[in-house]
C-alpha cells in the first residue's frame, strides 16, 4: 500500500535535493518503485520481471498536482519536454443519468459548474476531503480528470498539500491518492507553500537552500510558515482570513452598494474578484442582471470589490505580524531574524490580485516597523504545482 503523508502542524523536512533523499528523514519517499507483489506462479514472476525491465527503459513522467479547494492544477512536461503543460480546472463534479442507457455519467470542472449549477459539488471546501463520502466523490473527480487528460500511469507524482492539522482529512486525501492511476514510479507530498515558493526564487530549486517566510493566501485558509533549507518551521493556519470570505464579503457589499436591488451568488462574486480586483488601478465596472417578470437592470460597482480586498489584506497582515511572527520568534529566534532579512514569499490565489505584493510589503513593514521585501511567482495560483513538478523531476533524476 502506498504510504501517503500530508503536512500537519508538525515540522516537515525534505532531504537535500542534490542527493538521494534520506528515507529515514521526517519527510520521506511515499511510494517505492512501481513493482508487483510476489507470486508463486513462475509465469507471473516472469511477466513481472519483463514489466520491470520495460519500465527501467522508460523514463517516469514527472507530475506536480495541487488538489485545491477551488481549483485543481496539474503540471507535466509539454510535448517537447521543454516547458510545462498545465491542466487547470474547478475542483467540482456533477453526475447525471444518460438519457439512453440510464448509466451514471460524470462531468467535472467548469463544464459541471456551468451546466449543472443546481447539483454541482465542490469537493474540498475545507481544503481536504471532510469524510469518506466526500473522499469517494473526490476520487471520482480525480480519476475522471486523469482519464480524460490521459495522464501517464508510470509517473513520479508530487502533491502540494495544505498545512492543515486535520489527521482525518489527511487520511481521506490519502485514500484519494491511493485510488488514482498515476504515480506508478513514486508518490510524495510536500507543503503547498514550499512548492509555491520554488518558482518565486528562480528557475530551479533555489528555494530549498534558502531560509525564508512563506504566506499562502488560499481560498479556505491563510497559512504561514518559515522554511530552513526545506524544513518547515512553526506552521500557522487560520480559517478566519480566506479568499472564500472575500467572495462572501463582495456579495454582501454588492447588495449594500446597490441598495438591495442586486443580489449575486458567491460564484459571481469570485468572478468579480478575479476579473476586476486591482490594488494598483481598480476601475469601476458595470454588469446587467435580468429582473423577475422581464426586463434587465444595469448597475455599476465602485466599492464592493476593493473594500472586501482591502479588509482581507489588513486582516492577513495582522495575522502574520501579530500571531505568526511572535510564535516563530518565540520558538526559533535565529530563524526569525534571518528570515526577515530575506524575501517573504506570497503564494495562493489571492496573491494573483495585481498590486497585492507591494501593498502587503508596505503594510507588513509598517506593522513591524522595519523594511521587508515581499515577492511572488509570476503565476502564484500555478506556482505550487510547478514547484511540485520540479521536485518530481529532481527525484526522478536522483533515482
What is the predicted role of each segment?
Residues 170-180, 357-365:
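Short, aromatic/basic amphipathic alpha-helical patches
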